[in-house]
């Protein structure tokens, strides 16, 4: 296909146009008075949401060059979502603001490479400052505040996540499920999560979230490598007759056997998924035994005199639900409390008896996985559209609370970044010079952008409010919900430090790359072929 090649300022301006479109669509959702965005779906009803990354993923422009700009800024949001699970809108607004400021300087003749160096140095300084100002999350009240802010000022959701963390521990698993009623409920069930995902992406059942979800499945657990599909055929036939989904947990699966499973899955013969067994060596065998205890199944192992080809449905485990992503598998089990309890006691005795600190640590991990359980939040809503929106908000809230536990909290509502702008200016003026100084000052001018946008979405003058906030103490910011200046930490308006840090780092990274762009190569749009003309010939009139 022929390519279009665009140079210099024209290239950067085309990228900027794409960024403007995406940033505006995402920025309307920022803050307590942010609005929703409606996404048209080819199949099913439209989606009404308030989630930055979901909106960013939907935007595709007709112009190839502008679309490249959209993809670049989407990357900042996507990376922030991967690392921190929240803060995608902040990352988008920041990246857009840094690019806008930077392009003015590049157009005026500044050297983009030196500017980028200045932006990078400013980012390192700010990351260190965010860490200094972060305060550890002390109690469940602080966790509830983080969850409530991230879920769009929903205090009930914040409290529910705090309760879930109390029950399953801060490292515990909190999973989301679509409820059957109008109310959102919390349920603590037996279950565990281990860090192995699906072997093949063809096992995915929810393409949008790239997850495989199996309801009421049977579970085949084996410690051997599956080389031949013939070994699996008897058990596959028995499960297919029952009409239940099947999860296979094995050391590995050879390509030929895996291909057969994938074909059966795609043809709808059997809803099947496969994951590799967690751990290695003797620990793998013990973890498989834990999973077998939890699910009421048996480990098909030659050590126990059991062979795959002679396995029956009775040796399979069962669960209420299994969620598999590319990185981990969550099993929500039911009704094996006595067996799980005695298994936990056995592990506790092993912990007491062992002298090795490494073994102790690994046994503690196993105990936490087995005894901790899984907190299931059943999301309730009146309509499917509201359900999807609530689910996305809850997902953000869970990720934000986990990020807060990891790296602490800072004043929210864009306050931290706005207060750091004058500190950055002072540091840069004393430590940098020439165009590197200009690069750092570009970041300083862009830092209040999230606060300005939050104020504008609340119908206020963003520029005036950000200047007033800068004059006040570090913890004091603007509460856009009540339209007043308050101590953000005391008012419970907080952001996880990890989210603020990730948003800033990813925004600065993408902005630096855009500013140093001198040429873009994109596909030329194909011209529509003219339809065939009518056939010629003699006509009788």
From Swiss-Prot:
Major localization class: cytoplasm
Protein family membership: Belongs to the chaperonin (HSP60) family.
GO MF annotation terms: ATP binding; ATP-dependent protein folding chaperone; isomerase activity; unfolded protein binding
Enzyme class: isomerase
GO annotation, biological process: chaperone cofactor-dependent protein refolding; protein refolding; response to heat
Species name: Synechocystis sp. (strain ATCC 27184 / PCC 6803 / Kazusa)
Assembly and interaction partners: Forms a cylinder of 14 subunits composed of two heptameric rings stacked back-to-back. Interacts with the co-chaperonin GroES.
Keyword Mitochondrion (UniProt): no
SUPFAM superfamilies (UniProt xref): GroEL apical domain-like, GroEL equatorial domain-like, GroEL-intermediate domain like
PROSITE patterns: CHAPERONINS_CPN60
Protein name: Chaperonin GroEL 1
């Amino acid at each position: 296909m022929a390519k279009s090649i665009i140079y210099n300022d024209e290239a950067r301006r085309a990228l900027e146009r794409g960024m403007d479109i995406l940033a505006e669509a995402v920025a309307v959702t920022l803050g307590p008075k942010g609005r929703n965005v409606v996404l048209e779906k080819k199949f099913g009803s439209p989606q009404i949401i308030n989630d930055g990354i979901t909106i960013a993923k939907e935007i595709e422009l007709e112009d190839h060059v502008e679309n490249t700009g959209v993809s670049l800024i989407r990357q900042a949001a996507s990376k922030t979502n991967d690392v921190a699970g929240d803060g995608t809108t902040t990352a988008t607004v920041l990246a857009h603001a840094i690019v806008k400021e930077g392009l003015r300087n590049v157009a005026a003749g500044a050297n983009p490479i030196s500017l980028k160096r200045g932006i990078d140095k400013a980012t390192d300084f700010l990351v260190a400052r965010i860490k200094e100002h972060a305060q550890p999350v002390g109690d469940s009240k602080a966790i509830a505040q983080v969850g409530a802010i991230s879920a769009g000022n929903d205090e009930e959701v914040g409290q529910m996540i705090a309760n879930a963390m109390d029950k399953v521990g801060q490292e515990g698993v909190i999973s989301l499920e679509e409820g059957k009623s109008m109310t959102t409920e919390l349920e603590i069930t037996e279950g565990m999560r281990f860090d192995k995902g699906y072997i093949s992406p063809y096992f995915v059942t929810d393409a949008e979230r790239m997850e495989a979800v199996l309801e009421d499945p049977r579970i085949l657990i084996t410690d051997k490598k599956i080389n031949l599909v013939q070994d699996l055929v008897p058990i596959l036939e028995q499960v297919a007759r029952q009409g239940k989904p099947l999860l296979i947990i094995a050391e590995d699966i050879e390509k030929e056997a895996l291909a057969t499973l994938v074909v059966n899955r795609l043809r709808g013969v059997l809803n099947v998924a496969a994951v590799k067994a967690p751990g290695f060596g003797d620990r793998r065998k013990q973890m498989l035994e834990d999973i077998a205890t939890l699910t009421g199944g048996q480990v098909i192992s030659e050590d126990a005199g059991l062979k795959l080809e002679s396995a029956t449905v009775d040796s399979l485990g069962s669960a209420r639900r299994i969620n598999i992503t590319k990185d981990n598998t969550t099993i929500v089990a039911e009704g094996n409390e006595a067996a799980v309890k005695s298994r936990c006691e056995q592990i506790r005795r092993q912990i007491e008896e062992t002298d090795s600190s490494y073994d102790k640590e690994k046994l503690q991990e196993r105990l936490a996985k087995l005894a901790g359980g899984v907190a299931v939040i059943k999301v309730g809503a009146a309509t499917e559209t509201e359900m999807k929106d609530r689910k996305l908000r809850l997902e953000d809230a869970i990720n934000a609370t986990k990020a807060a536990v990891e790296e602490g909290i800072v004043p929210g509502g864009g306050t931290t970044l706005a207060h750091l702008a004058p500190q950055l200016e002072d540091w840069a003026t004393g430590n940098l010079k020439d165009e590197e100084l200009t690069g750092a000052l570009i970041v300083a001018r862009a830092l209040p952008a999230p606060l300005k946008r939050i104020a504008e979405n609340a119908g206020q003058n963003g520029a005036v409010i950000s200047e007033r906030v800068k004059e006040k103490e570090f913890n004091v910011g603007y509460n856009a919900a009540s339209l007043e200046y308050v101590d953000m930490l005391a008012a419970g308006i907080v952001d996880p430090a990890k989210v603020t840090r990730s948003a800033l780092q990813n925004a600065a990274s993408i902005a630096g790359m855009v500013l140093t762009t001198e040429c873009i190569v994109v596909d030329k749009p194909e011209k529509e072929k003219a339809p065939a003309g009518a056939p010629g010939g003699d006509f009788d009139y």
